[in-house]
């Protein structure tokens, strides 16, 4: 069954998301909002109040405060949410009250989320106002064993409750997935996982911002392998392997994580273009995790070394785009690094002969789906 095609007169979208927090400020959500604005839609982003919204935007943002800021308030409301889904219920109620008559003028609710919040709130808003609900699922608990990607930031004393929280969250999430009119998500693995709950699911890859991530030959006096992004426990074995190989070859690895040597968002493009190789770390324990840095390196046509191969969506995309290699084989890794080092010695830069690159620009990805479905 195909996803329902909305009338072409639809112009007013209420986009609901979790808070756009630093440092990235939810690039997928922001780019979706800007895409629809550029296409002539009236867009309002509805989200929870959480710090400063320190990014440029051409659409109104409505924020709702849910917590007072005290630890006690957070604890009580977290427990109450576990028992009653307070977070989603209260957010929806406040949203309808705050927006009042304006909220009924929207034609569709589009909710982008990585967790069960604000999926439940968006469902309540759409159901109460009799509007279609589209869900954009950025992450799933099941994509990493034990949900270590989802809950790595939780404090130590919450760990014993993680299994219970996860089970409740998944049940609430799946209830919304079944009710959605259409769903988009980030990889073929995610599509296959969601399809039993709702057949109207399609992949819209995260892609890259073509205005920031584009090919440009920049000569450097140093060949480096660059890693940019968060570093989780399940990625560290792969990192240690590459570090040992690079050390044997006398090549440096520059690590840029949110905690150590972070790179400002507007400087990411040049940082990638100055790299000899972009390192992507994954694990066979993960499913469908297509890191944004893969797309950004693809946009800049920089060679990608993915260690190990996830033997799934990421390895398939790297092969499809000829963006580099995905492997755990030490000799393949050494050969790949040596070849790129020799290319740098000859030219002063590296450049990957990619394929299908333009189709993974964000606007191209959004056009492929939303131009016919909204």
Language model features by range: what are they?
Residues 328-335, 343-373:
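A charged, aromatic-enriched C-terminal amphipathic alpha-helix characteristic of glycosyltransferases
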Residues 90-93, 117, 124-128, 139-144, ...:
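Membrane-proximal helix-turn-helix segments that form the acceptor-binding/catalytic region
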Residues 68-83, 131-170:
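Acceptor-binding helix/loop patch of EC 2.4 sugar-transfer enzymes
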Residues 2-65, 182:
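N-terminal subdomain of nucleotide-sugar transferases
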Residues 186-189, 207:
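Carbohydrate-associated surface elements
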Residues 23, 234-237, 264-270, 278-298, ...:
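Nucleotide-sugar-dependent
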Residues 100-118, 131-134, 138:
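Short N-terminal targeting/anchoring amphipathic segment
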Residues 207-265:
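Conserved catalytic-core segment of nucleotide-activated headgroup transferases in glycan assembly
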């Amino acid at each position: 069954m195909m996803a329902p095609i909305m009338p072409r007169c639809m112009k007013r979208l209420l986009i609901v998301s979790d808070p756009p927090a630093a440092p990235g400020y939810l690039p997928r959500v922001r780019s979706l909002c800007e895409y629809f604005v550029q296409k002539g839609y009236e867009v309002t982003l509805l989200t929870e109040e959480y710090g400063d919204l320190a990014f440029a935007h051409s659409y109104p943002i409505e924020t709702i405060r849910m917590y007072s800021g005290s630890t006690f308030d957070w604890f009580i409301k977290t427990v109450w949410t576990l028992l009653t889904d307070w977070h989603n219920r209260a957010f929806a109620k406040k949203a309808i009250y705050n927006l009042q008559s304006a909220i009924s003028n929207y034609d569709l609710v589009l909710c982008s989320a990585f967790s069960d919040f604000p999926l439940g709130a968006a469902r309540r808003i759409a159901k109460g106002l009799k509007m279609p609900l589209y869900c954009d699922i950025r992450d799933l608990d099941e994509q990493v064993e034990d949900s270590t990607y989802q809950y790595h930031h939780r404090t130590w004393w919450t760990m014993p409750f993680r299994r219970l929280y996860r089970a409740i969250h998944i049940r609430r999430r799946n209830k919304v997935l079944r009710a959605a009119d259409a769903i988009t998500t980030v990889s073929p693995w995610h599509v296959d996982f969601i399809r039993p709950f709702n057949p109207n699911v399609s992949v819209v890859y995260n892609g890259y911002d073509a205005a920031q991530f584009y090919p440009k030959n920049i000569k450097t006096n140093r060949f480096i392998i660059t890693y940019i992004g968060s570093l989780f426990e399940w990625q560290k074995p792969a990192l240690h392997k590459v570090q040992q190989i690079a050390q044997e070859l006398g090549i440096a690895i520059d690590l840029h994580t949110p905690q150590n040597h972070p790179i400002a968002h507007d400087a990411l493009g040049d940082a990638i273009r100055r790299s000899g190789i972009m390192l992507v770390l994954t694990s066979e324990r993960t499913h469908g995790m297509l890191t944004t840095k893969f797309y950004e390196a693809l946009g800049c046509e920089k060679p990608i070394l993915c260690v190990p191969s996830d033997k799934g969506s990421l390895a398939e995309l790297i092969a499809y785009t000829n963006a580099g290699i995905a492997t755990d084989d030490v000799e393949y890794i050494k050969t790949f690094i040596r070849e790129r080092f020799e290319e740098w010695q000859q030219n002063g830069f590296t450049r990957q002969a990619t394929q299908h690159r333009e189709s993974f620009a964000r606007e191209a990805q959004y056009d492929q789906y939303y131009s016919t479905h909204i």
